[in-house]
């Protein structure tokens, strides 16, 4: 299956856009999904020399931070992959807050995500596959039980979802 977007718009001929709502409606059990995004994939590939790469958004930020606490790495680098998007910066700041540094609350990060410049096109109704539900999903949190998204690069870049470790 192919999923992806260019400047938030679904790619012609792909099975899905980068829509949490569309993906949530699909039966993906035992299916492989190839994802292409404007910024996230590029940022992930640039991090491939790191010891471990995790992908997070507000939906799995808390679970990802809990995983990082358990692993206790000497250094954590948070990358906001959208070059001008406040929603990615808000998520990184929220994760930094959860890690014990300066940052913002979940409520603040959620509000910034819902009101980000990039979110506006999901509310204006100009494209049938850009829905307000996608921004609501992106701004939601599944809490500590969310899936941890690990990236492996061998033999090819691949993100795999793992249950959050229990305390």
List where the protein language model places each region:
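Glycine- and Gly-Pro-enriched alpha-helical subdomains that act as flexible
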Residues: 59, 63, 67-72, 84-103
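Residues that scaffold, gate, or flank divalent-cation-dependent active/transport sites
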Residues: 1-29, 41, 66
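Nuclease catalytic cores that cleave nucleic-acid phosphodiester bonds
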Residues: 25-26, 42-45, 54-69
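A short acidic, often aromatic-flanked loop/helix-cap motif at beta-alpha or helix-coil junctions
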Residues: 8-11, 61-63, 154-157
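Short beta-strand segments
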Residues: 3, 35-37, 56, 79-81
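Residue-level preference for the first positions of well-ordered beta-strands
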Residues: 32, 75-77
